[in-house]
From Swiss-Prot:
One term under GO cellular component: eukaryotic translation initiation factor 3 complex
Keyword Protein biosynthesis: yes
Gene Ontology BP annotations: formation of cytoplasmic translation initiation complex; translational initiation
UniProt organism field: Phaeosphaeria nodorum (strain SN15 / ATCC MYA-4574 / FGSC 10173)
Classification via InterPro entries: eIF3l (IPR019382), PCI_dom (IPR000717)
Subcellular location: Cytoplasm
Pfam families, per the entry: Paf67 (PF10255)
Keyword Cytoplasm assigned: yes
Compositional bias annotation for Acidic residues: 17-27
Origin organism lineage: Eukaryota, Fungi, Dikarya, Ascomycota, Pezizomycotina
Origin superkingdom: Eukaryota
Alphabetized GO MF terms: translation initiation factor activity
Name under which the protein is recorded: Eukaryotic translation initiation factor 3 subunit L
Length: 488
């Protein structure tokens, strides 16, 4: 047996704490079970419930991917089928009495729903930008609400609310019985599972829309560990950590992003020996995207990586990885190329303007510009560091001369770098929470006023790390006071 095709789009994910071998083996067994699972066979054994519609057939259709070259009419019909299905589930008199085969199926429905939404929005945007197919433009103009952002979000939030899954998860965190908070609908597996995976769906949709903080906020009630339900479905596991990691990256929390990406890559490397051939290509493609994102994050936030990941990075990117770390103008095209390769297919929250195609903005290009602005802000860091390795003290004007920039421009860059340099890491609680003492994102530290730069180690062993510090304006007075003192 093989997995449904839509599960083949994604690969497995891995939760943060992976030291427990027994639980690791449990997750591996779950993975093997999924490899042998055929969702459509289970669907065929589900009881049919009819109320002027065949709910069984609609559930089966909801978990089945469209053909890649599906026509617009087919996509419209698929949207109508989803609307009918979710309307029946959410608005029937009382909960629908339907036993789902397992939680894999519930993920399949939500995953395919969002995938079709994303694909339709991307296709509609492409049609608007090309502006060369009047027939399709007419169809899209006449159906502005089909696969609308509001409709999709409304379904996901409604499933979460109807199932009271947030209340159930909060109760579980407190050590209470979740069933006491589930209500009439939430105690049914159909609603509980759809509600749970709708939370993961919201993470994905908000990230696609570019609201990265809200994307992370949606997971407040879900704990990122191997005991969570999403960790038992490899596609959901992969999706969760990919979008959490990408959201962290776009919020400039690179340490947290590296942590999320690393756990996925390590997990996939440990399970690849029993991955089926049907999934291999998809997993390989997603792995390449992950490694590209790790390479980007490490360029911004140098850190020690797992040996498996570090070796794979060197094999995949080699000299490109070195160019990213060196920075400078020559690295800009490489950053852009890797971002295009690894980023999600961003979408716009509103339909494009078919009457004025010149005002339409490609969402991917929009987020690429935002990302490249951050790259340019950090572009000089490696170069500055290389100069400061040669000097104990350097005047700001002298450093600006080496960099061939105006002193005031360099001062502005240093101030921006100072503002973005310190960050705290996520350890527990909501993903947006920052706990612990702020840490240096890089080894560049600043004073309140920038007039000169100094290279000083924090300890005897730190000389090799190239730590450099921007000291305040009274550095000269300190130097004058230290004249004549012995060096050691």
């Amino acid at each position: 047996m093989s997995l449904p095709q839509h599960q083949n789009r994604d690969a497995a994910r891995r939760a943060p704490d992976d030291d427990d071998d027994a639980e690791e083996e449990t997750m591996a067994n779950d993975y093997r079970e999924q490899v042998q699972y055929d969702g459509m066979d289970d669907m065929d054994r589900m009881p049919s419930i009819s109320n002027n519609q065949d709910i069984h057939a609609q559930l089966q259709a909801a978990a089945t991917p469209l053909e890649f070259q599906a026509t617009l009419e087919t996509k419209f019909a698929s949207y109508d089928n989803y609307c009918n299905l979710f309307h029946y589930i959410l608005n029937s008199e009382g909960p629908v009495d339907l036993e789902v085969p397992n939680y894999y199926w519930a993920w399949d429905v939500i995953d395919e729903f969002i995938y079709q939404f994303n694909s339709f929005c991307s296709y509609r945007q492409k049609v608007a930008l090309k502006n060369d197919n009047e027939e399709e433009i007419t169809l899209l103009r006449e159906n502005p609400n089909t696969w609308g952002c509001y409709s999709v979000l409304n379904v996901l939030y409604s499933l979460i609310q109807r199932s009271q899954i947030s209340e159930q998860l909060a109760a579980m965190k407190r050590g209470e019985d979740a069933a006491l908070y589930a209500g009439e609908y939430g105690n049914r597996p159909l609603y509980k599972m759809l509600g749970y995976f709708s939370i993961i769906g919201l993470l994905r949709v908000h990230c696609l829309l570019g609201d990265f903080s809200l994307a992370l906020k949606t997971l407040d009630d879900i704990e990122l560990n191997k005991k969570a339900m999403f960790a038992r479905v490899m596609a959901a596991h992969f999706t969760t950590y990919y979008y959490v990691g990408f959201s962290y990256m776009m919020m400039r929390r690179y340490a947290d992003a590296i942590r999320m990406f690393s756990h996925i890559l390590v997990y996939v490397s440990r399970t690849k020996n029993f991955q089926k051939n049907a999934q291999y290509d998809s997993i390989t493609k997603k792995n390449d995207q992950m490694y590209a994102l790790v390479a980007i994050c490490v360029a911004f936030h140098p850190t020690r990586l797992d040996d498996t990941i570090h070796t794979a990075l060197r094999e995949k990117y080699g000299e490109q990885f070195n160019r990213l770390q060196r920075g400078g103008p020559d690295a800009l095209p490489l950053f852009e190329e890797l971002f295009r390769t690894a980023c999600p297919k961003f979408i716009s929250p509103t339909p494009p303007d078919f009457d004025n195609p010149e005002v339409n903005i490609d969402p991917v290009e929009h987020h690429l510009r935002i990302f490249m602005d951050e790259v340019k802000n950090n572009m000089m860091s490696p170069t500055v560091k290389s100069y400061l390795k040669l000097y104990t003290t350097m005047d700001l004007k002298k450093l600006a001369g080496f960099l061939e920039v105006e002193p005031e421009k360099l001062r502005c860059w240093l101030l921006v770098n100072k503002q973005r340099n310190r960050q705290t890491r996520w350890s527990e609680g909501g993903l947006l929470e920052r706990r612990g003492d702020p840490q240096q994102r890089s080894r560049l530290r600043h004073g309140k006023e920038i007039s000169s730069t100094c290279l000083r180690p924090r300890s005897a062993g730190d000389w090799s790390t190239g730590i450099f510090v921007i000291w305040p304006g009274h550095t000269k007075a300190r130097r004058r006071a230290s004249r004549g003192r012995p060096l050691f």
